[in-house]
Regions:
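Electropositive, glycine- and tryptophan-enriched low-complexity nucleic-acid-binding patches
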Residues: 1-80
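Acidic, serine/proline-rich intrinsically disordered regulatory segments
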Residues: 16, 47-49, 55-56, 68-93, ...
């Protein structure tokens, strides 16, 4: 099922090697920092972070905002002897000089996953992509049955609906802690969750799929 109109949204999901799910970043189509969006976002679930971008992509501005709102607060909780490691793919906004500089200023090391390897060895992509999309798809189907088909709507769901779906999906996965931790138990990432390690890890991935993108 589908509507006759589509809108993009990027969902940036960030997990840590201890099984923590950090606030997600939702990037909707729209004017960056528009007054309407800011007012609207104030009514959304508070556990996530929201931005607008013309094409709903992660760009330099959104990436810097993510580092300020999500990455920096988490890094600040790390003990002094811990060196956080950020896993990123080769997406262009991850390579911009301003982004690289800010990551360095936060005292974070970066491990880049080579192009074409994200779906093979990126923890978020390998371990969370499918369960997250499954939960989003289920809520989409329920919406189509209850709103789309019954009322004959041809418009896509409201941004608030999507924000709630993401929130619900994250709560479900958070409640099933093994989903997040198991994402690290593949492709030699288990050393990150070794009790003796002196490094913590933050894993992210950016994927350009229409309708749902997982960072």
């Amino acid at each position: 099922m589908s509507t006759n109109d589509t809108k993009r949204v990027t969902v940036a999901v960030t997990i840590t090697a201890d099984g923590t799910l950090l606030p997600s970043t939702l990037v909707f189509e729209g004017k960056p920092d528009g007054c309407i969006a800011k007012k609207e976002f104030s009514t959304y679930p508070k556990t996530h972070f929201y931005k607008c971008q013309e094409a709903a992509w992660m760009d330099e501005e959104v990436m810097i905002a993510w580092m300020k709102e999500v990455l920096a607060p988490y890094v600040a909780t790390a003990p002094d002897h811990v060196v956080p490691i950020l896993i990123l793919d080769m997406y262009r906004c991850h390579m911009i000089s301003s982004v690289v500089q800010m990551i360095q200023e936060l005292g974070v090391k970066v491990q880049h996953i080579p192009g074409g390897c994200t779906s093979l060895c990126q923890p978020v992509d390998v371990g969370l992509n499918k369960p997250f999309k499954d939960r989003m798809r289920r809520q989409w189907m329920n919406w189509m049955i209850n709103e789309g088909v019954v009322h004959g709507t041809t418009s896509p769901p409201a941004r608030l609906d999507v924000a709630k779906w993401v929130h619900n999906a994250m709560l479900e996965m958070k409640g099933e802690g093994k989903i997040i931790r198991n994402a690290w138990k593949r492709y030699d990432y288990e050393w990150f969750i070794d009790n003796d390690t002196r490094e913590q890890d933050v894993g992210t991935n950016n994927n350009g799929a229409k309708g749902l993108q997982v960072m």
